[in-house]
Swiss-Prot record:
Role: One of the primary rRNA binding proteins, it binds directly to 16S rRNA central domain where it helps coordinate assembly of the platform of the 30S subunit.
Gene name in the database record: rps8
SUPFAM superfamilies xref list: Ribosomal protein S8
Biological process, per Gene Ontology: translation
Lineage: Eukaryota, Rhodophyta, Bangiophyceae, Cyanidiales, Cyanidiaceae
Coiled coil: none
NCBIfam families reported in the protein's UniProt record: PRK00136.1
Organism name: Cyanidioschyzon merolae (strain NIES-3377 / 10D) (Unicellular red alga)
Compartment(s): Plastid, Chloroplast
Keyword field contains Secreted: no
Predominant location category: plastid
Protein name: Small ribosomal subunit protein uS8c
Ribosomal protein as UniProt keyword: yes
Length: 117
């Protein structure tokens, strides 16, 4: 299991167990995805801690979070063919990690990492 999948699973499980904090593996991709979630108001804060990231969750903000592009099957999309979803998609583009709405505004496509609502 890759670190992004681990992070999403830990957030999902902590949210269901009503935990306030969760420790996830530290990586640059996890940090960038966590920053996007924080900017969108889905998590309260992210703090680096040794080899982990400490994420403070907001109660009942994330209803569902899932991995789209996996190591065995990468999913890419241009900004013109971005799928319509309930909630938002997090995209890794050449301009950085961002939501699918921001990618459409900037007219860049990329790898669809995960979805959240």
């Amino acid at each position: 299991m890759d670190t992004l999948s681990q992070m999403l699973t830990k957030i999902r499980n902590a949210q269901m167990a009503r935990h306030r904090w969760v420790l996830v593996p530290a990586s640059r991709m996890n940090w960038n995805v966590a920053q996007v979630l924080r900017e969108e108001g889905l998590i309260a804060q992210v703090q680096p801690a040794d080899l982990h990231l400490r994420i403070q969750l907001k109660p009942k903000r994330i209803q569902r979070i899932w991995r789209v592009s996996k190591p065995g099957l990468r999913i890419y999309s241009s900004y013109k063919n971005m799928p319509k979803v309930l909630g938002m998609l997090i995209i890794s583009t050449s301009k950085g990690v961002m939501t699918h709405q921001k990618a459409k505004q900037m007219q860049v496509g990329g790898e669809i990492l995960c979805g959240v609502y």
